[in-house]
Every structure is written in C-alpha cells, then in structure tokens.
Amino acid sequence: MNRLMILVFAAVILALASADEDVDITKRGVPCLCVSDGPRPRGNNLSGIMWMKTGGYGGNGCPKGWHFCGKSRGFFSDCCKR
C-alpha cells in the first residue's frame, strides 16, 4: 500500500512539473482574492489564480505575463493575475 501511495504521489508531482505554460491556467487554477477585488457587501469576486512558487519563475512566483495581486505573499504560492 505504501508503494502505491508513493507511486501515485510521484505521478502527480511529475504531471504538475511537466505542465505546459501555454495551457490556459485560468480554467484549471484555484481562484484567489486580489487586492483589486476589494471588500464588497454581497461577496467578493475571486479574479486571481493561485500559482505555486517554483524555480523557473521570477521572485514573485508568477509566470511571464502575470503579476502579483494579493495582499500578502504565501509560503508556497502567490495570488497572480493576468
């Protein structure tokens, strides 16, 4: 059972690592709250996308063409907007 869990975990990590940048991440990403979304009385729109910090991206964790839009930086991820 432990070997199966390790194999599945490794497959997920490899799939994430080999994800193509050209894929439209806005359709498959996790939404997050940008500063520009602001507090609204009827709820907030989540216009940002959560990006995992990896070595290939800049210091802010966002890929090319995206900018950091969150209130504070996360330890493993940042909220980015196109």
From Swiss-Prot:
The keyword Secreted applies. Its main location: secreted. Disulfide bonds join 32-79, 34-69, 62-80. One of its GO terms (cellular component) is nematocyst. It is found in: Secreted; Nematocyst. Keywords: Cleavage on pair of basic residues, Disulfide bond, Ion channel impairing toxin, Nematocyst, Neurotoxin, Secreted, Signal, Toxin, Voltage-gated sodium channel impairing toxin. Residues 1-19 form the signal peptide. GO terms for molecular function: sodium channel regulator activity; toxin activity. It comes from the Eukaryota. Binds specifically to voltage-gated sodium channels (Nav), thereby delaying their inactivation during signal transduction. Causes death to crabs. Belongs to the sea anemone sodium channel inhibitory toxin family. Type I subfamily. This is Delta-actitoxin-Aeq2b 3. It comes from Actinia equina (Beadlet anemone). The lineage of its organism: Eukaryota, Metazoa, Cnidaria, Anthozoa, Hexacorallia.
